[in-house]
From Swiss-Prot:
<comment type="function">
    <text>Catalyzes the reduction of the double bond of an array of alpha,beta-unsaturated aldehydes and ketones. It also reduces the nitro group of nitroester and nitroaromatic compounds. It could have a role in detoxification processes.</text>
</comment>
<feature type="binding site">
    <location>
        <position position="102"/>
    </location>
    <ligand>
        <name>FMN</name>
    </ligand>
</feature>
<dbReference type="Pfam" id="PF00724">
    <property type="entry name" value="Oxidored_FMN"/>
</dbReference>
<dbReference type="GO" id="GO:0010181">
    <property type="term" value="F:FMN binding"/>
</dbReference>
<feature type="binding site">
    <location>
        <position position="60"/>
    </location>
    <ligand>
        <name>FMN</name>
    </ligand>
</feature>
<comment type="subunit">
    <text>Homotetramer.</text>
</comment>
<feature type="binding site">
    <location>
        <begin position="164"/>
        <end position="167"/>
    </location>
    <ligand>
        <name>substrate</name>
    </ligand>
</feature>
<dbReference type="InterPro" id="IPR001155">
    <property type="entry name" value="OxRdtase_FMN_N"/>
</dbReference>
<keyword id="KW-0560">Oxidoreductase</keyword>
<comment type="similarity">
    <text>Belongs to the NADH:flavin oxidoreductase/NADH oxidase family. NamA subfamily.</text>
</comment>
<dbReference type="InterPro" id="IPR013785">
    <property type="entry name" value="Aldolase_TIM"/>
</dbReference>
<keyword id="KW-0521">NADP</keyword>
<protein>
    <recommendedName>
        <fullName>NADPH dehydrogenase</fullName>
        <ecNumber>1.6.99.1</ecNumber>
    </recommendedName>
</protein>
<dbReference type="GO" id="GO:0009636">
    <property type="term" value="P:response to toxic substance"/>
</dbReference>
<keyword id="KW-0285">Flavoprotein</keyword>
<feature type="binding site">
    <location>
        <begin position="307"/>
        <end position="308"/>
    </location>
    <ligand>
        <name>FMN</name>
    </ligand>
</feature>
<dbReference type="GO" id="GO:0050661">
    <property type="term" value="F:NADP binding"/>
</dbReference>
Amino acid sequence: MNTMLFSPYTIRGLTLKNRIVMSPMCMYSCDTKDGAVRTWHKIHYPARAVGQVGLIIVEATGVTPQGRISERDLGIWSDDHIAGLRELVGLVKEHGAAIGIQLAHAGRKSQVPGEIIAPSAVPFDDSSPTPKEMTKADIEETVQAFQNGARRAKEAGFDVIEIHAAHGYLINEFLSPLSNRRQDEYGGSPENRYRFLGEVIDAVREVWDGPLFVRISASDYHPDGLTAKDYVPYAKRMKEQGVDLVDVSSGAIVPARMNVYPGYQVPFAELIRREADIPTGAVGLITSGWQAEEILQNGRADLVFLGRELLRNPYWPYAAARELGAKISAPVQYERGWRF
């Protein structure tokens, strides 16, 4: 069977062998707490490349030490990180996958000891510390940190950069009126709340000419928060700035009850793809080959991002191929076991 899931996809000169993407998922495995790649990362990510995932995106990687979600996160704030990341890139590419990295700053959701920063001095919840409101100098330094991270990612050999603007972390905190109470040019109107992300995109694009993704939370799940419709003009602006794909997730800007079910976020990706005319990635409880194929065949998204399913089964592409009646190449070492 000819499938879309196992057809190549080209984006800004990079051709992926299929439409399956491993979502960035924090592993919290830097036991040295210095942001360096560890043995776990060198096993975990290449295993999914062996499993025939087309694109693997490395977890949220801190552009500053304080920008990490936890002390056990990967980092890209120092040139000392480049060698380990370069080794990881080589291991993944050796097994036929493309590799990206998600550049991130946790903002008020950072659990690293010390001062935390955010657009406004508004805590995430009643049990969270109150962050320091960022000054203009803080904003400039953080934009520069994203650019420096992009430069290091390029030196390490990554194929794709994704900017993390979702899940209640720093960039998302600027975008949402629930967390951004500023009265200057970085707060208030939708245009002002987008300004920080816009500056990050421009700064990254100055040093990075490869495929650029942005992950968003397309719904705040709050009556006073943002909806997928609100993200359409943002996505149009991203496209104008040279973003190639919007990775569409949702939630986590404030504590909220979410109705979670298979494919629950796919309509957000579909709406943004249709109304902003930009490629999108769909993510969220996509578990079967037929489900992934339906999303692609019906033009609801361009790529399918898998998270927990690839934690359960590093060889999910093989299972999906069998389900769809498609034939894919097996690693030579596994040919005796991969039967179609």
